[in-house]
Regions:
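Conserved acidic donor-binding segment of nucleotide-sugar-dependent glycosyltransferases
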Residues: 285-296, 301-307
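Conserved donor-binding/catalytic core segment of Leloir-type glycosyltransferases
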Residues: 172-198
Length: 338
């Protein structure tokens, strides 16, 4: 049987552009035969419109097509698919890329990577379009059975998100501090986190706290000279914070593909996850501590679990299971198997 050609359809979110983060990095590790780069379209799509005419056009487009700008990348895909039937199109952020009219791929195949929990997709009305995909890749394993049940085709598989282990790893030149670090934005509970931070700062006069997130989350935090909020920092600065921290604290509302968890794990961080969903972690329980979203229990867990050395067992586990080299090979093998 002739091997399928595979095509990348993707872009980088603004906060992932020119960084080591983001699932779009998979194109560096999978030998795609075709690249459909949708970056210009999504740069414009996510830009806030202020022109009244543009706002009106966006509303009309949303009514007709379900998106505020016509997705011109579809024309390129359709044209390529019109003359071939041996291509597997890989939509790397299917929540944004895979639209309710997938027949534009012709007699080729569509594989959609999904990053969000099922309940989020249901709110976004994305479940029905995804039912038309030939296969779905989940980057989290917890909802695999649920997705297969809802989609109803037994065509949902789990291949995790990757991480740049050649960049994120321990360095002898960086020393640990009594530092609590929180990184990330999506599905983080900063209201809960702030309660934890304030109690910790009252109890521990030496502790420093650094939160790395998007600017919109700054207002959740109560000002304190030992609580620093950062956004838009370099990969090198972020890596150094992982390496300096004595604990990485993630207040997770729900599971999602988690760059910060993998980055921290690759750096050998001491990781504490507070969540009411015990399946939040990519990482076995011997490498990460899980606690309910209870302020007192979380504070106690953090106070008793500062670590001043790297967790080298976790570093090895991440490298063996989540390096982009490993994930790229798994993904390419799956895509070419159709």
């Amino acid at each position: 049987m002739k091997e399928k050609k595979i095509a990348y359809v993707g872009f980088a979110f603004l906060h992932h552009k020119n960084t080591k983060a983001g699932y779009q990095r998979i194109k560096e590790y999978v030998k795609y035969d075709y690249i459909f780069d949708c970056q210009k379209y999504f740069d414009r799509y996510f830009k806030e419109e202020k022109n009244p005419v543009s706002i009106f056009v966006a509303k009309v487009m949303s009514k007709i097509f379900g998106v505020k700008l016509f997705p011109w990348y579809i024309i390129k895909i359709w044209w390529k698919g019109l003359f071939r039937r041996d291509i597997v199109f890989h939509f790397v952020y299917s929540e944004s890329l895979f639209l309710p009219f997938p027949r534009y791929i012709g007699r080729n195949k569509a594989v959609c990577t999904v990053h969000q929990p099922l309940e989020v997709l249901e709110k976004w009305n994305m479940v029905k379009p995804l039912c038309k995909a030939d296969s779905i890749i989940l980057v989290g394993e917890a909802e695999l059975e649920k997705f297969n049940s809802v989609i109803g085709k037994n065509n949902v598989v789990y291949i995790p998100h990757g991480i740049s282990t050649d960049f994120y790893h321990p360095l002898d030149t960086v020393k640990k501090k009594r530092l609590l670090l929180t990184v990330g934005d999506w599905l983080r509970d900063f209201v809960f986190a702030n309660k934890v931070y304030q109690k910790l700062l009252d109890m521990d006069p030496v502790l420093q706290i650094v939160v790395v997130s998007r600017e919109k989350n700054r207002h959740y935090l109560t000002a304190n000279p030992r609580l620093k909020f950062l956004c838009g920092i370099s990969d090198e600065d972020l890596r150094n914070l992982y390496l300096e921290s004595s604990v990485l604290f993630l207040p997770l509302l729900r599971y999602t593909a988690n760059n910060s968890l993998l980055e921290a794990g690759a750096c050998g961080c001491n990781i504490i996850i507070s969540s009411d969903h015990p399946d939040n972690s990519y990482i076995p329980s011997q490498y990460v501590k899980l606690v309910k979203m209870d302020v007192d229990k979380t504070v106690s867990m953090i106070m008793n679990n500062h670590a001043m050395t790297y967790n080298m067992g976790l570093v090895k586990y991440i490298e063996d299971n989540y390096s982009w080299d490993v994930i790229g090979k798994k993904t390419e093998s799956f895509l070419r198997s159709f």
